């Protein structure tokens, strides 16, 4: 169904609010490097309806307020043999990359999510944690609708709309975010992201 500007703005406002409220919780995921840059956050996360209303349109009802800004960031993921990985509380169930319509690349995560869940005989009702790349609020909302996800489980500590979209690092950031949430709380979680050309990738993790 159609996703209007009000829905997009509300999702973006929520992403900023959740990120702001989760700063202390998310601090454990950050490894400080020898720089002062990480101490200076240029974004207040104080997005509201008034700011959204003043935001310039990019295309249609997509605006600068409900679009992730370009950002610099990095995330570290280590690849190991199967045995060391099984010693950790968070277990890799599987991951897939699937192809979709190259003219609708933002919807590609839907097929990837469905595929990886089918492979493991799971459905969305079994998920307790969901991380989706929100390059645009409309894209995140469309993927939530298309994959039948519970929006209350998606990006519960904010997403790229609040933190920015560091292209080439965004997927690893989702994986790190999901890993830490599952390690802290247990459950089954999925992270999904789109890429240019209609590529969708999804990662499925579990923690007892």
Predicted features by range, described:
Residues 3-14, 43, 47-50, 65, ...:
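Conserved active-site and cofactor/substrate-binding residues in soluble primary-metabolism enzymes
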Residues 7-89, 146, 151-153:
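N-terminal extracellular/periplasmic Venus flytrap/periplasmic-binding protein-like
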Residues 49-111, 115, 119, 176, ...:
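Condensing-enzyme catalytic core mediating Claisen C-C bond formation in acyl metabolism
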Residues 77-78, 131, 190, 204:
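Structured core elements
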Residues 141-146, 150-155, 160-205:
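Internal helix-turn-beta structural module
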Residues 93, 99-162:
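Active-site pocket-lining segment
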Residues 1-2, 10-11, 60-69, 128-130, ...:
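Cysteine-centered functional microenvironments
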């Amino acid at each position: 169904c159609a996703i209007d500007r009000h829905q997009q703005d509300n999702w973006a406002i929520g992403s900023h609010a959740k990120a702001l409220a989760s700063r202390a919780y998310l601090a454990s995921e950050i490894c400080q490097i020898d720089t002062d840059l990480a101490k200076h956050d240029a974004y207040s996360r104080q997005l509201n309806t008034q700011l959204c209303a003043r935001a310039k349109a990019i295309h249609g009802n997509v605006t600068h307020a409900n679009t992730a800004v370009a950002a610099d960031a990095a995330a570290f993921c280590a690849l190991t043999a199967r045995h060391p990985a099984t010693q950790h509380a968070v277990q890799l169930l599987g991951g897939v990359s699937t192809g979709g319509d190259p003219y609708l690349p933002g919807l590609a995560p839907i097929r990837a999510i469905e595929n990886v869940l089918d492979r493991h005989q799971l459905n969305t009702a079994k998920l307790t944690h969901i991380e989706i790349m929100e390059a645009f609020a409309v894209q995140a909302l469309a993927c939530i609708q298309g994959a039948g996800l519970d929006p209350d489980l998606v990006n519960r500590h904010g997403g790229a709309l609040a933190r920015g979209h560091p292209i080439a690092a965004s997927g690893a950031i989702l994986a790190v975010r999901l890993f830490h949430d599952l390690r802290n709380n247990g459950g089954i979680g999925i992270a999904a992201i789109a890429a240019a050309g209609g590529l969708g990738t999804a990662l499925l993790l579990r923690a007892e």
